[in-house]
Amino acid sequence: LIRSSIAIGLAVFLVGQSSSEDASKKLAVDESTFRCLTEMEKTELGAYFVDNVLGNIDATLAIANSADGGEFPAGSVISLVPSEVMIKHQTGWNEATADWEFFELNVSSEGSTIVSRGTTEVVNQFGGNCFGCHTQARPEWDLICGSDHGCAPLPITRETIVNIQNGDPRCVNKASDA
């Protein structure tokens, strides 16, 4: 009974925190924010792609490529696969998620459509809660999962991830327009 009460209390606390968004710290994000992966910067290890909606790509890349981790700057955009994206809002936007917002997208040659966005409630195409997984990352990784960052392994292989990345339909449309 005590364990259940603690679990329920923690869940209520987290849900309460997920709603603690400071609108003045929120970045403007809409469907046009999300670009073809090849228009973003690939990290040195090639594991994921980054961008920065505020133009601070050098600082975002420095943290993404750091062997020691660090805190990503506001505006950072992180994407492992085309349909899953994290965006870092201004400091103080949402303490529970270290100012990250999670997005599940539908992507096509026409662009991106936001299916779901939020803090602790977004679920990906595999049925996993984005925040639930990313919160397992050790503090120095700023909620970014990697093979040695403390997160549970993904249910798909690296080869499958690369195939999904290479198949971003938004990029195919750009290539055929050229």
Which residues make up each language-model segment?
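Bacterial Sec-dependent signal peptides at the C-terminal "C-region" and cleavage site
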Residues: V15-D22
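Generic detector of short alpha-helix boundary/capping microenvironments
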Residues: S4-I6, I63-A64, E121
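N-terminal post-signal-peptidase region of extra-cytosolic proteins
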Residues: L54-G69
